[in-house]
């Protein structure tokens, strides 16, 4: 299971002052560009990609529709993604499938999509249908993050992940049940078939994230042969 940590600068000065040594035990860097004004994203990008040269980067524009900090039309959203990709070709690009389905056809040539769905209110009853629709599109990664209202919601998310991974062994999944109630799902990825777990360093990018230090300790125990 790969560890993903976010970088969330709010201006170019913060981007330039990122301490990359804090990320040495992280497998993937997620640049949450939505913490910037939309007109600053392209100008801040060089600082991010230079800081993390040689590291795998996920470019994410988490919009307000899915718990993020930026509001964009469908066309603004896809145009920004295309601009960053054309210049920097990040290893992964997050695409909010259900929020921007109208422009998904413009992303069909992208081989490195993280097709994502976030629901900060609930674990929807149609979660299995969401898994199915996104998996059929065969992106690089299917990412699903939902908020549980009960222990059963957490177990449902984990069971669906395991089921779809079993049926689609070549497909990568990154799934999590958010908040304190859902923390178990962030720790048990290897058991259910979730390839990534998202951790926090100085600031969490989603509720229920475990700190990098704690995650390293937990994974050490879980992966130990003794």
From Swiss-Prot:
Active site: 118, 143
Keywords: Amino-acid biosynthesis, Aromatic amino acid biosynthesis, Lyase, Schiff base
Catalysed reaction equations from the record: 3-dehydroquinate = 3-dehydroshikimate + H2O
Pathway: Metabolic intermediate biosynthesis; chorismate biosynthesis; chorismate from D-erythrose 4-phosphate and phosphoenolpyruvate: step 3/7
Cited SUPFAM superfamilies: Aldolase (SSF51569)
Origin superkingdom: Bacteria
Listed EC numbers: 4.2.1.10
PANTHER family: 3-DEHYDROQUINATE DEHYDRATASE
Subunit structure: Homodimer.
Protein family membership: Belongs to the type-I 3-dehydroquinase family.
Protein task: Involved in the third step of the chorismate pathway, which leads to the biosynthesis of aromatic amino acids. Catalyzes the cis-dehydration of 3-dehydroquinate (DHQ) and introduces the first double bond of the aromatic ring to yield 3-dehydroshikimate.
Protein's recorded name: 3-dehydroquinate dehydratase
Species this chain originates from: Streptococcus equi subsp. equi (strain 4047)
Lineage of origin: Bacteria, Bacillati, Bacillota, Bacilli, Lactobacillales
């Amino acid at each position: 299971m790969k560890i993903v940590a976010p970088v969330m600068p709010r201006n170019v000065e913060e981007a330039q002052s990122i301490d990359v040594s804090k990320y040495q035990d992280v497998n993937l860097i997620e640049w949450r560009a939505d913490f910037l004004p939309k007109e600053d994203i392209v100008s801040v990008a060089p600082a991010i990609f230079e800081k993390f040269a040689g590291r795998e980067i996920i470019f994410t524009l988490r919009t307000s529709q899915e718990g993020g900090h930026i509001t964009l039309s469908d066309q603004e959203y896809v145009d920004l993604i295309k601009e960053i990709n054309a210049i920097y070709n990040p290893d992964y690009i997050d695409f909010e499938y259900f929020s921007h389905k109208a422009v998904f056809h413009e992303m069909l040539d992208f081989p490195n999509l993280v097709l994502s769905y976030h629901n900060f209110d609930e674990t929807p009853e149609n979660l299995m249908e969401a898994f199915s629709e996104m998996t059929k599109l065969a992106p690089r990664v299917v990412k699903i993050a939902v908020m549980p209202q009960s222990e059963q919601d957490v177990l449902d998310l984990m069971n669906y992940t395991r089921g779809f991974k079993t049926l689609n062994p070549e497909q990568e999944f990154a799934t999590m049940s958010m908040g304190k109630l859902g923390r178990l799902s962030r720790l048990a990825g290897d058991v259910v078939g979730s390839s990534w777990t998202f951790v926090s360093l100085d600031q969490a990018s989603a509720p229920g994230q475990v700190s990098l230090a704690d995650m390293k300790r937990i994974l050490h125990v879980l992966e130990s042969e003794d």
